[in-house]
Amino acid sequence: EVTHWTAPAHRLARDLSRYAKDKSERAREELIAELGSCFLCADLGIVPELEPRPDHASYLDSWLKVLTDDRRAIFQASAHAQRAVAFLHSLQLAAADERLVA
């Protein structure tokens, strides 16, 4: 969810205007969020606990459709996810700097 948080214009400006209306756009954003979660967990040394959810199959199906229809989608999603992770890390560094100054 924290990767979704980075989307608004005052953060990273990912356009989510069609998220609720367009299944393909929703799948793209969800793929970005999932990759961002994976990248953050790897950076922080967190081993995710996998809990099967009823909607996992539908998420995977939507990602597969996007990835099949657009060969660049995985690279675009990865780039957006990496930008989100870098943004989140920058906030952590800024907060740490503020604590040092205070």
Regions found by a protein language model. Name each.
Residues 1-3:
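Short alpha-helix carrying the canonical HExxH Zn2+-binding catalytic motif
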Residues 31-39:
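Short amphipathic alpha-helical face segments that pack within enzyme cores
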